[in-house]
């Protein structure tokens, strides 16, 4: 199933972070925080401004992004967990 978010919303799949501390201790799932880094899976067409023009979304499918710890709404699609959030909730795009 494919998904197309509306307006300036973005669908993100969380990227798993390293589960081992610098000292080599494995961190269990119950103690680990949810990652704040993810991959953009789908983007909407953009935000409609007050004058009727549409401002396109600045992130693209495949971008790796940084977002707030409590940003977005968690959804499950075909057994996969995703986040749906507004573009404004994305703080940065990883480059390089």
UniProtKB/Swiss-Prot annotation:
Belongs to the GroES chaperonin family. It is found in: Cytoplasm. Together with the chaperonin GroEL, plays an essential role in assisting protein folding. The GroEL-GroES system forms a nano-cage that allows encapsulation of the non-native substrate proteins and provides a physical environment optimized to promote and accelerate protein folding. GroES binds to the apical surface of the GroEL ring, thereby capping the opening of the GroEL channel. GO terms for biological process: chaperone cofactor-dependent protein refolding. One of its GO terms (cellular component) is cytoplasm. Heptamer of 7 subunits arranged in a ring. Interacts with the chaperonin GroEL. This is Co-chaperonin GroES. SMART domains: Cpn10. Keywords: Chaperone, Cytoplasm. GO terms for molecular function: ATP binding; metal ion binding; protein folding chaperone; protein-folding chaperone binding; unfolded protein binding. It comes from the Bacteria.
């Amino acid at each position: 199933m494919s998904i197309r978010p509306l307006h300036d919303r973005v669908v993100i799949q969380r990227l798993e972070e390293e589960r081992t501390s610098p000292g080599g201790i494995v961190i269990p799932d119950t103690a680990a925080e949810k990652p704040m880094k993810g991959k953009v899976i789908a983007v909407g067409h953009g935000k409609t401004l007050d004058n009727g023009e549409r401002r396109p979304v600045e992130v693209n499918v495949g971008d790796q992004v940084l977002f707030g710890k409590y940003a977005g709404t968690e959804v499950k699609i075909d057994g996969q967990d995703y986040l749906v959030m507004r573009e404004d909730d994305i703080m940065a795009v990883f480059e390089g």
